Amino acid sequence: MIRNSKIIATIGDATDKVLRKIVEGAADAVLIDSYYGNNEQNVERIEKVKALREESGRDLAIIYDVDHIYAKNKYKLIRIDEENVDFACANDVDFVACPFVGNLEEITKVKELVKSHGKNIGIIVKIDCKDGYDNLDDILEIADAIMINRDELGVDISYEDLPGIQKEIVRRANEAAKVVILTTQMLYSMVYNPRPTRAEVSDVANAIFDGVDAVMLTEETAIGDYPCEALETVDRIIRTVEKNNAVDAERFEVEGYKMSISHAVSMTTKHLLEAVDVKSIVTYTKSGTTARFIARYRPNVPVLAVLPDRESARKLVITRGIVPYIEPKMLSMEEMLSNASEYSKEVGLAEVGDSILITAGQPDTGKGTVPPTDFVYISKVD
């Protein structure tokens, strides 16, 4: 069974000896953090991850956690460390995770710096302070994904308010069709123990119920005594939640306002699944935008996103429900329809006799909107 929700593992001393198991195991992405290693160590880790993912054929994403500069003698972030961004670009990571330092200009600077290097690196903005929460709508406009850092966010707001704010952030990210990652002490007891507490199991499960795209482990894998066991535990919890169909797709409906035609077609794709028994959705997409909007409605079958290159594919591996597939050739509509069955069979999403739903979008306009869908088609796998 395909696991829809994704898992991110933070790399550190504890994972160095078991990195192959991490890359070939349950992790969909890894996070490299300068807190757990210097530049020399992190370059070595990045290169090892790249070699292992190439060897295993997995499109595992690499996220680099960017440092921040503090005001002198004050616990206040004032800017993002641009040298860290340069390091991330030089090492061809897939995402950079940036703190929100009180103004959107710093995030815009990061995007411009990445562009100046000629890189297509996704921007994850960490909601790690009240300013980040207060500016959430603007952040969702410019970020590719957000990360709820409960550790630092919990310092800036009352702890009793944190659960409600967490749920609100997840909901608003879902509505904006942006990836939302939850982190901090997901299975913290497993830093020292081989089994999680019942409360931690519930925390992970409730995150999936609420609609997060990905759960991220930090100390559990970076410095813990049981990194592989922690990863396997999160995997089992998520699979059990999804197997029991415990994620309420109906709460991801959008009501009460007009939407674009392309957005409406994505929603219609979801509704077609309720009327027709299909095993998967195959969507042809240049940038991944169409696939993200379809996945935003939490369909009960996987979304096979057919993309032209691995760089684009790795941008989708942290999005819930999406399985990337590389097809570098430009296909005609007839080829799209005929090839979809073969792609689905190849990755194990459908068998002969199953029905699949096929969609295709026009090239991205570059304006941040969903490209118009050319067709929606239901086909039998032969």
PLM segments and residue spans:
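Non-catalytic helical/linker scaffolds that mediate oligomerization, partner binding
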Residues: 1-382
